Amino acid sequence: RLCFINKCDRTGADPFRVLQQVRDKLKLNAAAVHYPIGLEDQHDGVVCLVTHKAVTFSGKSGEIITIGDVPEHLRDQVAKKRKELVEAVSEVDDTLGEFFLREETPEVEDLRAAIRRATIARTFSPVFMGSAFKNRGVQLLLDGVVDYLPAPHEVENVALDLDNDEASVTLTADPKAPLVGLAFKLEEGAGLSQSPRSAFAIVHTRPAKGALRP
């Protein structure tokens, strides 16, 4: 699982207080993979603690993304939070734990791979930060889905065979097999114009087997 602390642009935003609540109330081994660049009306972006790069968002919808060095005034805090991240993952990943014991700094790919292993094993939850309304940090959250969550062929999905007394069937991620998926959201009347003739339903589907083709 991934966590996203939203509304870092709101008055009173305190993402690390929320992170502590995630640990205390949900009992998760969680640590931030982001450090906010400013809060409330000063929130401009985040520092990625994995890549050690500052990512800022501008434009009307956060569509202009700038990647640069960590601001000097944040370097001490960023170093501290990155160390916390490495410690949290090291507790549940032996490979990264060796870096920690040797007091070595892991490379970006080493840390990213360790976070992925621990996330898939459900022993660690990476915590992202941003503002969904202003589209800041959402792009990095989607990158996190790719980087840290399992691909379809890496998990076991089970369906019910309706023609065989609802017997359980294990699905394999074979694109040539008959389509099986989960329709998890329906938007009725989601036409591209206001004309009744153009109204149709959009079905959001998560395929587990096979492929959906027009």
Tell me what each language-model feature is:
Residues 1-214:
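Structural and coupling elements of P-loop NTPases
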